[in-house]
Amino acid sequence: VFADPVPAMYDFMPGVERARTAVSPDLDPDLIVVCDGDVSRTGAVLADNAELFGRVPIVNIDHHVSNPGNGVAAAWVDPGAAATCEQVTLLLPHLGVEHDALGGAIAQLLMAGLVFDTASFAHSNTTPRTLRVASELVAAGAQLPMIARRIYRTKPNAQLRLFGRVLSRLETSVDDRVTWSVVTLADFEAAGATLDQAEGLIDLLAQSATADVVLLFKDLDDGVRISVRTRDGGVDATRLAGAFGGGGHARAAGASHEGPFEAAR
């Protein structure tokens, strides 16, 4: 069960057709496992099932440093993990689950999480342990080249048009150390793109040769969503996002602002 619909870019992943955004009323679990965020990040899943979440023990597995790990039966928060999928890969053998289970489908899914959160193992969050875990997943059947290509190097034309509009209004500070842009609902409509196709925009902006801090503002109906990227050894992105009640990692974080774009900017 996911807090949001699975974006179309992941339609190649095994079992994606089983993804749901609502809990079946017939479900009576003994345990709830919340991954990749604290329980509050489950959004409508929590709001629509408050009685269930209050009654059933919760285990929280996450790698975000901003997660306090509170209010659950057990929490494993490891900011040293590149992705929650790294933690799950380490956990599975202790549960008696082989990495090549389900014909390699589990390895495919876990590798996709590693590839996404490390930008194909290019980010500084990639550690020796991350690479060891990845090698185990490849040995278990994960198709690393295909996964990296589908996540980072395959984009519909509508998404490319959207990127072009956002890049055309790129702004920088006087010293070029801060770079930002905004994507609006009008951009999505003009490009014929969907909201999830803004994925990857912030990483493209972060390729700036001079910027220490990069921001992307998504000006949407329900407010402004802010994505932050910072250079290694520089500003802590969680401190910037924290000013808006957000969080994440030292180099990549996000937040939301209920007011207009100009106020957030």
In which residue ranges do the predicted regions lie?
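Hydrophobic helix-and-loop "lid/oligomerization" segment in the mid-to-C-terminal part
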Residues: V1-D11, D28-P29, M111, V115-A243, ...
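N-terminal small/polar loop signature for handling phosphorylated ligands or for N-terminal nucleophile
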Residues: V1-L52
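Short, polar loop motifs at secondary-structure junctions
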Residues: A3-V6, I61-S66
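Short, hinge-like loop/turn segments at secondary-structure boundaries
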Residues: G15-R20, W76-P79, D232
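Short glycine-rich anion-binding loops that position phosphate/pyrophosphate groups of nucleotides
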Residues: P25, G37-S40, H64-S66, L185-A186, ...
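Structural motif
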Residues: D30-V33, P57-V59, V213
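Short amphipathic alpha-helical segments
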Residues: A44-A47, G71-A73, V228
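Short alpha-helices
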Residues: H63-V133
